Amino acid sequence: MPTWFEDWLQAEGEAQSLRIWSPTLIPGLLQTADYARALFLAEQTDISDDAIDALVAARLERQTILDRADPPDVVVVLDEMVLHRLIGSPQMMHDALVNVAELSRRPYVVVQVIPVSNGANAGLGGAFYIAAADGMPETLQMVGVEDQTTEKRSLVRKAAVAFDRVRGDALPRDASRDLILKVADDKWKS
């Protein structure tokens, strides 16, 4: 496991709040096992089924922070194209989107969607995650060609401003959930 990701896992595990911007995929904390498996199969070349199983298990283990006694406050903003991008099969997409909608019913999980009709937004440069906890510097994970985790204040601040802007462009929580379920049923339901 790369050092940058180990750093992120520690920050994520200790976080009291997480802000996530994802313009291309359902973020790992909200993925189903089938969705994660389809992603890993698409991303990895020449990897065994056992290795894929281990990656999926690790992804699902990360999600246990949402079930702890004092879970972090999680705010996720998705680009609407995430809802329309086929990962795996149509049934997998349906199930993945219903899962996101159900998780968003938890009081500490907010999922908002930026409609494609909004056009360009402040987050089109790539996905990022910001973890915060009392007594610790905020940690930023930037996802892209060269993934990295950093506590560099200028980068964290820049990402926080971008997050506030994309969140401001997004539909409210309930309207976002309605859109997620509409796409799940209208586009992906078998």
Feature locations, PLM:
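Interdomain hinge/linker segments and adjacent boundary elements that couple functional modules
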Residues: M1-H84, D134, T150-S190
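C-terminal regulatory/effector modules of DNA-binding transcriptional regulators
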Residues: S89-S190
